[in-house]
A protein has these predicted regions:
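Extracellular repetitive beta-rich solenoid segments
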Residues: 2-71, 110-111, 118-120, 135-136, ...
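Residue-level detector of short, conserved catalytic/binding motifs and their immediate flanks
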Residues: 47, 123, 186
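Terminal (often C-terminal
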Residues: 66-138, 146-150, 159-162, 200-222
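Contiguous, function-dense segments enriched for cysteine-driven chemistry
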Residues: 157-159, 177-178
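Short, solvent-exposed aromatic-acidic interface loops
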Residues: 158-167, 194-196
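Short, surface-exposed tryptophan/glycine-enriched loops
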Residues: 165-187
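Contiguous beta-strand segments of beta-sheet-rich domains
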Residues: 187-193
Length: 222
């Protein structure tokens, strides 16, 4: 460029030299994203993204958009027949570990039959089992109890089976489930109880197959 008089001193371009909105999308390199270094791991909660909020460009932490999908799916089972017991199921319990069976995410923990959740959230809690009634014992009941204070428990789901009038042992399925809002893992817990079991009644158990199993699936945040 030609000048009349003295050539001006060179100066670096600064942000104040450019009006807002003057640089269009067409002026940006096509590899402005793909040409940069890949993160290679899940972002930290404080990592930021640019989003268009009703046409206004804003930044957002990853913590607001992460998640989705099931993060906990755990199975436990009764490893031996439970005979003529009315009360909390507290023994012969194991997390499933054979063949194609498995669990997802952090595991439940159990102590004296009381199950503790690995994290807060809404959980689908269920019992699905096989029970046997002797001809002299007409009923079997399995109850899910829950607490919100790690102390007092109340019935929250129940499954019953009756073989009244049967001349011989009857095998039947028992199934019940509920959704538990785990707002505090120290206080919100569940247990499973048997009730109305006669002297010849029992829940079936095995270390190799899920005859009587307990299921915990985290559905989402509380």
């Amino acid at each position: 460029m030609s000048y009349i008089g003295k050539i001006p001193t060179a100066a670096a371009l600064t942000s104040s030299d450019i009006s807002d909105g003057i640089i269009t999308n067409a002026k940006l390199a096509q590899d402005i994203i793909s040409g940069d270094t890949a993160l290679g791991a899940e972002p930290a909660d404080t990592d930021e993204f640019l989003v268009s909020d009703a046409g206004v460009l804003k930044r957002m932490d990853y913590s607001y958009i992460k998640g989705g999908g099931i993060t906990v799916a755990d199975q436990w089972r009764l490893t031996a027949n439970l005979t003529a017991t009315n009360g909390t199921i507290s023994s012969n319990l194991e997390q499933v570990d054979t063949n194609a069976l498995g669990s997802l995410g952090s595991a439940m923990t159990v102590s004296s039959g009381i199950f503790t959740f690995p994290s807060t959230g809404f959980y689908l809690v269920g019992f699905h089992g096989s029970g046997a009634n002797a001809s002299s014992a007409d009923n079997m009941t399995v109850i899910i109890q829950g607490t919100t204070n790690n102390s007092s428990y109340a019935n929250i789901a129940e499954a019953s089976e009756s073989s009244s009038g049967a001349a011989q042992e009857q095998i039947a399925g028992l199934s019940t489930q509920c959704i538990v809002d785990v707002t505090d893992t120290s206080n919100v817990k569940v247990l499973f109880q048997t009730s109305s079991f006669g002297s010849g009644s029992y829940l079936m158990g095995s270390t190799d197959i899920n005859y009587s199993a307990f299921h915990f699936i985290r559905l989402g945040d509380t």
